[in-house]
């Protein structure tokens, strides 16, 4: 009897997944820990590797099938992995006919060895995977490798392009990924369940910009990470949550659950959709630790390597639409949380300061909150506290 290929544990509260792509077919030789397939959950894409050497026996669940944790999806005939292409066996050569030397060629990268998200990125940008250096396991190409290739300078074209391609179809129908369906459902559930209201304020970024500019080089030299603005906002948010505990609470049936810990979700946009990895116990971190943690989570998100643990929980979220140029927005709450802070683009605007007209770098901030648990006064006070701390960043450093 063959060795079963089963759906691994997917993390807390996750019981189902979808088979995104098999990389092996029945009869293929495999080695221990070699990639067999990818499965897609509501939040992440996970790799399933071979538990032993052998050949693929039977594939029970094909691409696109919904599967449960622990379910058998195929099996492996255990034994030494053998080459599947018998034509590659060496043939004897006669002594009178010397074999001409051939220049070794770089093996072509087959499309079926690319992860679905990587293949989509390669296809959309008309890239040749053979020209992309893979840094993943066994030299596989990751999304990070594709993005690095896209950002690299390209040499000038040396030949004319081929004849124009036929006009593209005006409509393309693509099946929604499990992640996209989950995002759609959760956002709609949020609007249907919570009494969402949004309040706004604006921040003069002059002092925090000056502080960052003065110490960013010294900070990076000492801590090995760049000093961004997100660490200031995370620290300011935590102080505001301590001042207004209801924003860090949630509704559970007939109870209000007040959380005395601060796990801050930071929204990250990826090719597959929006994910919100969590910075655990952010109140116990300094600026450098916050920047390192956010940077690491963002890289894992872009490379599709977030784990379920990275995405689970969270007591409050921050979304920075400003990195895309957003001037103002009304972010949607990530349930069961009761609030989300929206950051936006900093731009110079004319403002009145002590009766004088001045030009200052200003940012609009927004708090979307569940009005069932948070009163308007509390929501406004929450943003006022953040405004106060960002406009006087020395208070964050002195814990004032």
UniProtKB/Swiss-Prot annotation:
This protein's record includes keyword Transferase: yes
Cofactor: (R)-lipoate
Pfam entry (one): Biotin_lipoyl
Domain annotation Peripheral subunit-binding (PSBD): ranges: 113-150
Top enzyme category: transferase
Active site as annotated: 371, 375
Start and end residues of each stretch annotated as Disordered: 85-113
Recorded GO MF terms: dihydrolipoyllysine-residue succinyltransferase activity
CDD domains per UniProt: lipoyl_domain
GO biological process: L-lysine catabolic process to acetyl-CoA via saccharopine; tricarboxylic acid cycle
NCBIfam families xref list: PRK05704.1, sucB
Subunit and partners: Forms a 24-polypeptide structural core with octahedral symmetry. Part of the 2-oxoglutarate dehydrogenase (OGDH) complex composed of E1 (2-oxoglutarate dehydrogenase), E2 (dihydrolipoamide succinyltransferase) and E3 (dihydrolipoamide dehydrogenase); the complex contains multiple copies of the three enzymatic components (E1, E2 and E3).
PANTHER family: DIHYDROLIPOYLLYSINE-RESIDUE SUCCINYLTRANSFERASE COMPONENT OF 2-OXOGLUTARATE DEHYDROGENASE COMPLEX, MITOCHONDRIAL, DIHYDROLIPOYLLYSINE-RESIDUE SUCCINYLTRANSFERASE COMPONENT OF 2-OXOGLUTARATE DEHYDROGENASE COMPLEX, MITOCHONDRIAL-RELATED
Function according to Swiss-Prot or TrEMBL: E2 component of the 2-oxoglutarate dehydrogenase (OGDH) complex which catalyzes the second step in the conversion of 2-oxoglutarate to succinyl-CoA and CO(2).
Protein name as it appears in the record: Dihydrolipoyllysine-residue succinyltransferase component of 2-oxoglutarate dehydrogenase complex
Organism, as annotated: Rickettsia bellii (strain RML369-C)
